[in-house]
Amino acid sequence: MAEGVFPGAIGIDLGTTYSCVATYENSVEIIANEQGNRVTPSFVAFTPEERLIGDAAKNQAALNPKNTVFDAKRLIGRRFDEESVQSDMKTWPFKVIDSNGAPLIEVEYLGETKTFSPQEISSMVLTKMKEIAEAKIGKKVEKAVVTVPAYFNDAQRQATKDAGAIAGLNVLRIINEPTAAAIAYGVGAGNSEKERHVLIFDLGGGTFDVSLLHIAGGVYTVKSTSGNTHLGGQDFDTNLLEHFKTEFKKKTGADISGDARALRRLRTAAERAKRTLSSVAQTTVEVDSLFDGEDFEATITRARFEDINAALFKSTLEPVEQVLKDAKISKSQIDEVVLVGGSTRIPKVQKLLSDFFDGKQLEKSINPDEAVAYGAAVQGAILTGQSTSDETKDLLLLDVAPLSLGVGMAGDVFGVVVPRNTTVPTIKRRTFTTVADHQTTVTFPVYQGERVNCKENTLLGEFDLKGVPPMPAGEPVLEAIFEVDANGILKVTAVEKSTGKSANITISNAIGRLSSEEIEQMVNQAEEFKAADEAFAKKHEARQRLESYISSVQQTVTDPVLSAKIKRNAKAKVEAALADAFSTLQIEDASADDLRKAEVGLKRAVTKAMSTR
């Protein structure tokens, strides 16, 4: 890689199933990986010898299911006991354990049992995307804009930012996926000047967002957002997988539920069938020797696939209704409905959406897999002063807080301070008081959600305001100040008005939240893993070179014409050097250096032995 640092910031769409990276140098470019693919699987695999990320990891998933990790985005920023985590664990072949309420992934790597946080797994995918960009740009990349689902809460946003830090990236901004896609639609298709209401329908591999934006004169104002951080293509695959499992059991009597390898092979076939059914009405699924020597073969029609997923498909309209209601806009006022995310290729999803908007033609001018990374790269260029076109130079993004933020009050009642769909960044204040006489300490539990009962919302953290003057209940004036930054991340301060005493929290004590020391430790660990990966690659290369050279020398020694060129009395020396090289090759943990020395030794013997007659 050439020296120097890339002055801009890359845009990374960190997806549940696939990730995508883009850069801006006079214009946006989506960067292909070493396989030539413009999207890279969000998979990390661990083996006794090495760590694999991306296509290489996904390709070996069936052979190594327990140590191939995916869906980290469905774990990041969540608690171990969350319903969605418990339900996903039933379908994942890898092991998830409870560490003080936070989920950790347990794998076998380099012959040891190791645990990784979802942030670390995500950081490995981010590192891969960074390396893909560096290979193309030829410079070191230090800055990035990373996208998250609009409906991600504070904990999930902060955890994603931490993943970027572990990957050695300065994450300039966390932006919402549908908003990034709106930029791609506006800038990429030249639609940013004309005034319009645009609904972004973003259904990906694991998450679903709907955002309603007003675009005019290069200003993108998010009016409302809604979604489901646990709905996407993976869920459609799971339903199809369950259907195929039942079919197989009917035909053979065998239940493959406990066989991780068979399940991975069948899931891959289900995913392929789902994609095929977007363009044809029927397809055949075949998996040779799926279980106990029994082959699997089944025909699936598009109608059956739609039937299997009918409830999930229908549920995608609920957030659409919600954003219209929140923005107080009727569906007839929507100028464009823009499709984003691979799962919007499903014809039934398109039909339901078009029918909801009374037969409206859906906007498909942007690539659903690449739009989010495209928008993130534009935002990266703006934040680093690298944007050159008039269209991007004056672009202004006004996003919103997806969920209400507030404080738990007496009786577990949620006191909202920042209502959902408030434009961010923002500062909001609300006054509270004491509930007991002579109370000198007040605890502020901070929640995010839409329910009146705090227990049904997400607890982000809590802090104490001490030194409140002892007064009768209800007399002290306590002001809670909520600051939400452009990343959607919250800082809360509480002030007692008569004394000016204050306490604050940037919610670092929430379950699973990493301290700066832990992040630093993980950064160092990531460097070690990278060094181990590089050492393994060098060893592999040296082994291949030695094998190839041994083979050519063996050919020379046994070929009557070629062996005639060897000096008299030298053949025995060549054979001895050949035996030495071969025995080095047999040593399993021989280092790259040992293998290189063996190759050099053999070359020296052969050079000396070749006759110059």
Swiss-Prot record:
Name under which the protein is recorded: Ribosome-associated molecular chaperone SSB1
Repeat in keyword set: no
In this chain, the stretch annotated as Nucleotide binding domain (NBD) covers 1-391
The role this protein plays is: Ribosome-bound, Hsp70-type chaperone that assists in the cotranslational folding of newly synthesized proteins in the cytosol. Stimulates folding by interacting with nascent chains, binding to short, largely hydrophobic sequences exposed by unfolded proteins, thereby stabilizing longer, more slowly translated, and aggregation-prone nascent polypeptides and domains that cannot fold stably until fully synthesized. The Hsp70-protein substrate interaction depends on ATP-binding and on allosteric regulation between the NBD and the SBD.
Q: PROSITE patterns of this UniProt entry?
A: HSP70_1 (PS00297), HSP70_2 (PS00329), HSP70_3 (PS01036)
Q: Where is the signal peptide?
A: none
Short motif Nuclear export signal, span: 574-582
Q: Which keywords fit this entry according to its UniProt record?
A: ATP-binding, Chaperone, Cytoplasm, Hydrolase, Nucleotide-binding, Protein biosynthesis
- What gene makes this protein? SSB1
Residues annotated as binding ATP: 16-18, 73, 205-207, 271-278, 342
Q: List the catalytic activities from the record.
A: ATP + H2O = ADP + phosphate + H(+)
GO molecular function annotations of the record: ATP binding; ATP hydrolysis activity; ATP-dependent protein folding chaperone
Q: List the residue ranges of the region (Lid domain (SBDalpha)).
A: 516-612
Q: Where in the cell is it found?
A: Cytoplasm
